[in-house]
Amino acid sequence: MLNAEHLHVARDSGVILRDLSIRIAPGCVTALLGRNGAGKSTLLGALAGDLPAGGRTRGATVRGDVALNGEPLRAIDATRLARLRAVLPQASRPAFAFSARDIVLLGRYPHARRAGALAREDGEIASRALALAGASTLDARDVTTLSGGELARVQFARVLAQLWPSEDAARAPRYLLLDEPTAALDLAHQHQLLDTVRRLSRDWNIGVLTIVHDPNLAARHADRIAMLADGEILADGAPADVLRPDLIERCYGFRVRLVDAGDDVAPVIVPA
């Protein structure tokens, strides 16, 4: 379990997260919804270990507790933490002409038997991760020449390579934190990526927290949905329980209605 208890984050501009608690369970995909500036990326950063609790860091005062598999996050060294959780931040374009394969191989360095020395197995994992991400054809491409969507798929392959199950601990609980992974993707690749995330969460026993802006995507691909508003968790539960017009309006300040899509999966959310 990756969990935050009574997490409180404040900056000079004001309070961002207010005494917030959330749990990310292995084998489960949790989608985090909220309007722009609600604190979603801040919460993800705290769960990733980028904003350690217990003082002031990166211009923020952070209080509360974050634990991974029962161990305080701040007690886990950087290499071991990188083996247990992977983070896909919002898109950032590399400044140097690495190949897509080079980027994906970055996810394997925490697993290197000797510092900085990768094995043949790591190259094989990189190839398989690129295939899972639908990016095999980009293998040798210079990442500075890729489109936003192509780069997003390569970076997704990187975090898959980082969490690739080892033979001796194939189902050890690990965690994947995704910050708007579908923002640059077309419709087909949005669903393909989230389908892959949900399948691997079960097959690899990974707990996933993914920030998404489209509640319709969350309804179809998440096991749980957490809504963040005014620095607090407004709702947290199964999509059918959380995606109600009244809660969506409180979350986004926007009135919606639910339309039956006729596929017994989830209703479609449209403007009221």
Curated annotation (Swiss-Prot):
Keywords: ATP-binding, Cell inner membrane, Cell membrane, Membrane, Nucleotide-binding, Translocase, Transport. One of its GO terms (cellular component) is plasma membrane. Its EC number is 7.6.2.-. InterPro entries: AAA+_ATPase, ABC_transporter-like_ATP-bd, ABC_transporter-like_CS, P-loop_NTPase. Residues 2-255 form the ABC transporter domain. It is found in: Cell inner membrane. It is a peripheral membrane protein. PROSITE patterns: ABC_TRANSPORTER_1 (PS00211), ABC_TRANSPORTER_2 (PS50893), HMUV (PS51261). It holds the Pfam family ABC_tran. Belongs to the ABC transporter superfamily. Heme (hemin) importer (TC 3.A.1.14.5) family. Part of the ABC transporter complex HmuTUV involved in hemin import. Responsible for energy coupling to the transport system. This is Hemin import ATP-binding protein HmuV.
